[in-house]
Amino acid sequence: MNRFYFAYGSNMNPDRIRERIPQARLVGKATIKGWRLVERLYADIECAKGCTVEGVLYLVSQTELYRLDAYEGFPNIYGSVQVNAWLDAKHCVNAQTYMMTATTKAARSGRPYPKEYRLICSTGAEYHGVKNEFRREGDPPFGYRGEGWGDAKVRKGAAKLDEWWHPLPDLGGGNAKR
């Protein structure tokens, strides 16, 4: 069974998500309401009335969610949480995302993003056109892929990434709220 997954940090980056779960289908940008993005060494979210977090919505299999669990350190580093992800003003789907555990929050509170991680997140945000809360003055231009990723794994140009874009024809199924 397929599920929606909402990414708000490094998994917004097309290269990163393809490396981790290559069969994920990109749905598009989405927003979760009543949450805010928090910098705790790595991206985190927390409930916050009146706030929103912009990110990217993917359609993934249960097997891919298990793989993401491993990458995210579930259940020790990040816990899984269900959110309502809004695709536009009318369409909302239930999606899984991750939120740091209380122990992780305490250990990482007040610690800034490592530059490499922040640049990976920033590139993903810019690629998808979501609010970029990761970019800092003096950062390299859009398209930065990150050191240590290996040139063989890096897609050259947007044309290759666009081959991966397969929007779903209809989101009105059982998961959609209207």
Regions found by a protein language model. Give the residues of each.
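Glycine-aromatic micro-motifs
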Residues: M1-R178
